[in-house]
Amino acid sequence: MADKEAGGGDAGPRETAPTSTYSSPARSLGDTGITPLSPSHILNDADPVSEQQTFLVVVAIDFGTTSSGYAYSFTKEPECIHVMRRWEGGDPGVSNQKTPTTILLTPERKFHSFGYAARDFYHDLDPSEAKQWLYLEKFKMKLHTTGDLTMDTDLTAANGKKVKALEIFAYALQYFKEQALKELSDQAGSDFENSDVRWVITVPAIWKQPAKQFMREAAYQAGLASPENSEQLIIALEPEAASIYCRKLRLHQMIELSSKAVVNGYSASDTVGAGFAQAKEHVRRNRQSRTFLVENVIGEIWSELEEGDKYVVVDSGGGTVDLTVHQIRLPEGHLKELYKATGGPYGSLGVDYEFEKLLCKIFGEDFIEQFKIKRPAAWVDLMIAFESRKRAAAPDRTNPLNITLPFSFIDYYKKFRGHSVEHALRKSNVDFVKWSSQGMLRMSPDAMNALFKPTIDSIIEHLRDLFQKPEVSTVKFLFLVGGFAEAPLLQQAVQTAFGDKCRIIIPQDVGLTILKGAVLFGLDPAVIKVRRSPLTYGVGVLNRYVEGKHPPEKLLVKDGTRWCTDVFDKFISADQSVALGELVKRSYTPAKPSQLVIIINIYSSEHDNVSFITDPGVKKCGTLRLDLTGSGGTAVPARREIQTIMQFGDTEIKATAVDITTSKSVKVGIDFLNY
């Protein structure tokens, strides 16, 4: 291959006879010049892998939008999964095997408490004092909804004050770290060191790279791991974790929502409603136990599966719904992703949003906005009261649901409007919501069910779209998991829409499925053998200009040579299958041999057929930074070649690099947040 140069500074192309379309400097849109020398996309399990560190225990943190928790397993007893100690506090009718994802900071912005403790303390504060404290809840969604997420992204507390999101996520993770290490130390009878622990943090599969990186940065700040010891922390995708756990289910650990088969004493003659009742009873009974045994072989459910059978996991949580399609590979039970993860912001928060809209309709948007600012703790109380009634909604419910209005709501409304809450309800045209003399909103079951409808409709529509895909048309099972999967209204909607296409199964401990699966993933991260790339990724390069093929506006003449600018050099395509361990290699040459840093812009697109980085839908999404200090020998060679190796088959994009001349490792930073 002819000699190639690329680079920063003023070094221009000096090539006269390129032998490859890639043999060109990449100098586009401010990129430091780079030359891809040897494009390759290979699977090579023999490549050196970093030495595996051994850990005594795996601790998984399920960091949820509405509730969070942790579970752990000692690596010597992988079949025993221990779910964290019971939380103090809790609401009637709500499982307290997890704790609310709520955090309280003092007026000085120092961490005070997390979970039920934070909520209860905030509730007991005097209203004038509460305004000074920073209370945050349901903040995880900010990472999904913020298009330009950075390390400086802010969150807004209940009192309207801003606080750095990274600080809040780090505080929350540090809290779980301390709780888990304390519990492990108590169990072991001696202090447990953080270095003994492999940490796993769950995130939605539909999250983009910046959000995953943000979670990792927060974990580093919380002291779970460090950039130097990044392998100590694994990011797990929530529906994948659920899938890993579901494949180990025994018959008594699940409820089938269909009238086709007898499952665990539920006969075909029973109504679907009886199945829901039984599901709730299973969930209730299961809360009594904290240690779960999992099969170290594949569960009984797979005895019906054959090589190549497919199933869908629908992870419906507080903020998002995540859909994953997996195919089983026997006999080991390894999993292959068949279609890139899809989903959207269709979690149970949508029901809360509809309730808030209803309150705005009855009492006025201006009042609700002011009430949230002036009485933040009372607003939290009102939403807690709604949460417990929301969980009582069911398709066959006939009696109304009562939601207690805090006294300060009634009092503040009278001051704000000059008339009573009761008067507002009478005057509003909202049917099905009445005022009771005990100071409660009485909602008819239809009114409550209507609050669920937009969110459930979105989930069903998304599933319908998924079932249209050829890869998904022959699925055998649909597993419904996540906290929102406990809602009988969602269960019935899924059963009605898809019960004739596949068998719909809910694990008994549906709210803990992801948590337990995340522990299993931490014990064996290689269980998912093939994933699908959610996006097309690549870099911008210069290619030799070809008359008639390249647009005239892309022509660049440098030192008498004609180049086409902004060419998209594709690493991987959207929805492409990528095996674990599959590597994408590129070689780059710095413009000047003495150059110490190469910065390469990474671009992404949802489309597959990308020709130029200026095509519609192509966005700059990150940078690859090659630090060449220390990688060279004593004498700087006339020409250096740096080979980068990228992995797209894991839950995060990873990169390594080596200086070909010296065979020394090059420090690589792949950054989707600070570019």
Swiss-Prot record:
Expressed most strongly in brain, kidney and heart with little or no expression in other tissues. In the brain, expressed in glial cells, including astrocytes (at protein level). In the aorta, preferentially expressed in lesions. Adapter protein for SORL1, but not SORT1. Delays SORL1 internalization and affects SORL1 subcellular localization. GO terms for molecular function: ATP binding. The modification N-acetylalanine is found at residue 2. It comes from Mus musculus. It is found in: Cytoplasm; Nucleus. GO terms for cellular component: cytoplasm; nucleus. Belongs to the heat shock protein 70 family. Its main location: cytoplasm. Residues 1-45 are annotated as: Disordered. It comes from the Eukaryota. Signal peptide: none annotated. Residues 17-26 have a biased composition (Polar residues). Keywords: Acetylation, ATP-binding, Cytoplasm, Nucleotide-binding, Nucleus. Interacts with SORL1 (via cytosolic C-terminus); this interaction affects SORL1 internalization and subcellular localization. GO terms for biological process: import into nucleus; inflammatory response; liver development; macrophage activation. SUPFAM superfamilies: Actin-like ATPase domain. This is Heat shock 70 kDa protein 12A.
